[in-house]
Curated annotation (Swiss-Prot):
Protein name per Swiss-Prot or TrEMBL: Inheritance of peroxisomes protein 1
Swiss-Prot/TrEMBL keywords: Membrane, Peroxisome
Ribosomal protein is among the record's keywords: no
Membrane topology: Peripheral membrane protein
Length: 343
């Protein structure tokens, strides 16, 4: 009995595929791929980002406050590290400077060329302070540099920091108080003092107060006394005339108000015969508490501002009828309050 064996499997490994490719391309010239220069330039541009420390100090104190409220001071970090470093992207145009606070970059802020940093004068010689003005939101950072041994900050540290800040931002190491005083002195010297010509102002009404008094040097003492007495008398008479003119104005004003008839709203609501022709109405005349003398003056001098639209002929006396009064042509301006005693 014959035993059937299993068929052999064809090897399909990587070497076999490579062998088959050589057999297919046997006798053909090799094909070279074209050279692409862009691929090489892309590879050359790929560089790792490098961080370079420009300045570092391990013992600083940082405080912050908003620009609108300088009294609201907050301590951000105390006894922490201060570092200024540069990030290089492989191109001179792609370099950025950053400010880092804390050992693990707890606070990081970019340093732009327009960033303003100023030195603050300190009372203590061992301290060195700078103020950094930040935006979005507007606030200030006060960085105090301290020495490790509680002594004076080394001069080398201050020089290195000032040299770095002067290159990457707007740094001012001058005392602001002295600088402002110098600026004000220079401004005062530069501005010339204006020459003001003082002229006497001519008043158009000055002739009313002027008195025709001759010079006292040419007048004897007796005549000067008489002139003084006459001037006092004239001033008293002038004051008296002013008082009299004020009384005349007040009296005329009272008479003008007296000609206005106070309107009684109750009687006008009961009768529909009356029509008000004047839009002016004084509220203070409607008060019922009016003195008897004032009411009598009103009846004598006031003029009616409201008349009946239809005149009641019964209220008119026979004497007026005999005079031949044409009531159809009578207007409200021609009728006085005395013509209608019933109102």
């Amino acid at each position: 009995m014959a035993i059937m064996g299993s068929p052999k499997k064809k090897s399909s490994g990587p070497f076999q595929s490579l062998k088959n490719s050589f057999l297919r391309n046997k006798g053909q010239p090799p094909q070279l791929q074209p050279w692409n220069p862009q691929v090489r330039t892309d590879n050359t541009k790929r560089k790792s980002v490098q961080r370079t420390t420009l300045f570092r100090h391990d013992y600083v104190k940082v405080r912050s406050w908003p620009s609108d409220n300088p009294k609201n001071i907050n301590v951000i970090l105390s006894k922490t590290s201060f570092e200024i470093y540069e990030i290089d992207m492989g191109n001179s145009k792609e370099r950025m400077n950053y400010l880092s606070l804390g050992k693990k970059d707890q606070f990081v802020h970019p340093i732009l060329p327009k960033l303003k940093v100023g030195r603050v004068p300190s009372d203590q010689k061992q301290e060195f302070k700078i103020i950094i003005s930040l935006f979005n939101p507007e606030r200030f950072w006060e960085v105090t540099f301290l020495s490790i041994n509680h002594g004076r900050v080394p001069r080398k540290v201050i020089n290195d920091l000032e040299q770095v800040l002067s290159k990457i931002c707007q740094y001012n190491n001058k005392d602001p108080d002295n600088a402002s005083l110098k600026d004000t002195k220079n401004d005062t010297k530069a501005i010339p003092s204006p020459k003001i010509d003082i002229l006497e102002e001519v008043d158009d009404l000055e002739y009313l107060l002027a008195e025709n008094v001759p010079d006292q040097e040419q007048i004897p003492e007796a005549e000067s006394l008489e002139l003084n007495e006459s001037s006092t008398i004239s001033s008293i008479s002038m004051e008296h005339s002013l008082v009299q003119s004020g009384d005349v104005v007040n009296k005329t004003f009272k008479q003008a108000l007296g000609r206005i008839k106070p309107i009684d709203f109750n009687t006008r609501a009961e009768s529909s015969r009356y029509k008000r022709f004047s839009s002016f109405h004084s509220a203070f005349l409607d008060v019922p508490r009016i003195s008897a003398e004032y009411q009598h003056s009103l009846q004598d001098k006031r003029r009616s501002i409201s008349v009946p639209t239809a005149i009641d002929y019964k209220s008119v006396s026979n004497h007026d009828m005999r005079k031949g009064v044409d009531f159809d042509k009578v207007s409200w301006m021609d009728v006085t309050f005395e013509d209608f005693p019933e109102i």
